[in-house]
Amino acid sequence: MIKEFINIIESMEGITDDWFRTGAFETYKHPTPIHYKTAIANGTVNTLEGPVDYQAGHKIITGPKGEQYPVNPQKFAEYYDDNKDGTATPKKIHKHAKLADHDGVVKASWGNLNYKAGEDYIVRHGAGDYGVVKKDIFKQTYDTTNDKSI
């Protein structure tokens, strides 16, 4: 997942805003607190989608399966309410998501994130801003009421 918050450069496989026009549904993250640490130095974390670089000050979030992913401080403040105890609660922000219909790579400025057809959801946070979420994690952390694929 940011695994969950990625600015797309462009994917040869066609993940663009237009890709979401058919088959996407409205969703939001459940308000279940997540755990995080603040990076004190630059580094790399191995996300479920591949290695991702981060900088000092980025928040390293631990997901429901123990997976980790970095989020820059601005995105963190935009998408989470900091509980000031090493946890944060996702804000209820409506987004669009779609189950990947092809294998590919989301190319972010800090690394490539792989996704597989039928195994990963692509979440559209805003124009040109996407995240990749494993299917089982998506079902645990996002509202799936409007998902016609399940």
Place the predicted regions along the sequence by residue.
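Signature of WW domains and closely related Tyr/Trp-rich beta-sheet microdomains
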Residues: Y69-P70, V133
